[in-house]
């Protein structure tokens, strides 16, 4: 079941104020696994805590990954103005994207 507890879709910063009391109340009323949409705006430390202490089974973090890719693509294109090949360009930000993806996965994996 998808819930919202202070999180916002398409949030591009990590300043969400998550209502953990609301999450606890919701999970006390249902045995259905919870989904937290808009998780990109939630700090990694809090995501890790929620993953290990609640029945949230899915964190939607697409905006965080798209923002990482887009920000790094812009930066790499500025640093490499002589690269025009689209395959080379699209590969420039992949290392940063892999790093952020790894961090995200590590912080939402149940223990």
Language-model segment annotations:
Residues 2-21:
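Glycine/Thr-rich beta-alpha phosphate-binding loop at enzyme active sites
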Residues 15-36:
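Alpha-helix-loop-beta-strand connector modules within alpha/beta enzyme cores
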Residues 28-33, 52-59:
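Glycine-enriched alpha-helix->loop->beta-strand junction motifs that scaffold or abut catalytic
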Residues 39-43, 61-64:
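Short acidic/histidine-rich active-site segments
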Residues 40-55:
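Catalytic cores of alpha/beta
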């Amino acid at each position: 079941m998808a819930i919202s507890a202070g999180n916002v879709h398409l949030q591009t910063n990590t300043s969400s104020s998550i209502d953990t009391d609301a999450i606890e109340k919701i999970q006390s009323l249902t045995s259905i696994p919870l989904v937290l949409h808009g998780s990109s705006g939630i700090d990694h430390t809090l995501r890790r805590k929620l993953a290990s202490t609640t029945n949230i089974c899915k964190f939607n973090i697409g905006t965080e990954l798209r923002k990482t890719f887009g920000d790094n693509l812009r930066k790499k294109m500025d640093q490499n103005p002589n690269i025009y090949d689209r395959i080379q360009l699209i590969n420039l930000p992949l290392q940063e994207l892999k790093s952020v993806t790894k961090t995200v996965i590590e912080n939402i994996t149940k223990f």
